Swiss-Prot record:
EC number: 2.3.1.275
Gene name for this UniProt entry: plsY
Organism from which the protein derives: Synechococcus elongatus (strain ATCC 33912 / PCC 7942 / FACHB-805) (Anacystis nidulans R2)
Name of protein: Glycerol-3-phosphate acyltransferase
Ribosomal protein keyword on record: no
Reaction catalysis annotation: an acyl phosphate + sn-glycerol 3-phosphate = a 1-acyl-sn-glycero-3-phosphate + phosphate
One of the GO BP terms on file: phospholipid biosynthetic process
A Gene Ontology cellular-component term: plasma membrane
Matches recorded under SMART domains: G3P_acyltransf
Lineage: Bacteria, Bacillati, Cyanobacteriota, Cyanophyceae, Synechococcales
Transmembrane segments: 1-21, 53-73, 87-107, 122-142, 147-167
Pathway: Lipid metabolism; phospholipid metabolism
Any one GO MF annotation of this record: acyl-phosphate glycerol-3-phosphate acyltransferase activity
Pfam families: G3P_acyltransf (PF02660)
Length: 210
């Protein structure tokens, strides 16, 4: 059991911390994406700095990191003969590790993204209805206001609310609520700009005062 937990934690962190946005900046423009735009390695900053194509690739990659972390955790736990309850808890554990790994990658001095896409990935793997509902809320707010951070926060709130009211397994509830709160926490600077009316819309440049 202990070896399974260690293996799952290491693999989930390795997957979650894979720096897709950083590598896109290095490969396409020879830049450190952390020194451009908002300083995030996530798809939104990649969109701002590198354009739509690279941003879409990074977004999909970051989603897949979350999906693969959950799938791998289930596979490792199942191979070791663990019962369904233990598998569910280990899958949720891997999901949380992957989400945190995305935003705190050791390879980049713990400066990553805001874990939105990776959170979506783990939710799609663990609770597709909640994951798709959160993504739907994100798309709706994005379409109405063209502010990515507002959509991300709305999606996180939607996930939290649904996990509280729907009959989801306890491990999924804890993962969903924790990841939702974490995503909102990672958007602290965005919330400050939203309150001041300074948060950029898609296509607008971010102020140098982050």
């Amino acid at each position: 059991m202990l070896l399974s937990v260690v293996a799952i934690a290491l693999l989930a962190y390795l997957l979650g911390s894979f720096p897709a946005g950083y590598l896109a900046g290095r490969w396409l423009k020879g830049i450190d994406i952390r020194k451009e735009g908002s300083g995030s390695t996530g798809a939104t900053n990649v969109l701002r700095v590198l354009g739509k194509g690279p941003a879409l690739v990074v977004f999909i990659t970051d989603i897949l990191k979350g999906v693969l972390a959950v799938v791998a955790a289930r596979a490792i736990a199942s191979t070791n003969g663990l019962d369904p309850s233990a598998i569910a808890w280990l899958a949720a554990f891997a999901a949380i590790i992957a989400v945190v790994g995305h935003s705190l990658p050791v390879w980049l001095s713990f400066r990553g993204g805001k874990s939105v896409a990776t959170s979506l990935g783990v939710l799609l793997a663990l609770s597709p209805v909640v994951g798709l509902s959160g993504f739907g809320a994100f798309l709706l707010l994005l379409a109405l206001f063209r502010i990515v951070s507002l959509g991300s926060i709305a999606g996180a709130i939607t996930v939290i609310v649904l996990m509280l009211i729907l009959p989801e397994p306890l491990p999924n509830k804890i993962l969903g609520i924790a990841s939702g709160i974490y995503v909102i926490y990672r958007h602290r600077s965005n919330l400050d700009r939203l309150r001041r009316g300074e948060e950029p819309r898609i296509g607008q440049r971010l102020s140098t005062n982050r």
